[in-house]
Amino acid sequence: MLTAPSLGYSLLAPILIVLAGAVIGVLVEAFVGKARRTAIQVTLSIGVLLLSLQQLWRIKDLSSTTAAVGSVTIDKAGIFLQATIILLSLVAVLLIADQDNFVAQASALPGSPEEQNALQEKSQQTEIFPLFLFAVSGMMLFTVASD
């Protein structure tokens, strides 16, 4: 009979919060209309990163070598690196949210009529935000991985 592994959810919460935000971002991308999608994605990304930073602050004095069956070691250095990643990610989200520097659609060539039509229709693609959150969660896990 198999036994379930014991996980330190409170110690893994900063990573899990960012992962959950990425999944919610994918759902927003799938089900929200394009007129409201950008504002929701930016707000969601910033909110998720701030919530994760708050959880990191809560666990700043804790440590564990068995947070995920020995594969994750939570210590002060890992928490510091995770906080650094989150703070830099907050700045990066604001840079990504500036849509003037990105093409409206990935398939449109810069300066082409397709790009002009996409800019006039304000049909910007926003899947970068959930992809970015998935990448941030991976970076956060990388800093505390011990296996």
Where would I find each of the regions flagged by the language model?
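Alpha-helical transmembrane segments of multi-pass membrane proteins predominantly involved
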Residues: M1-D147
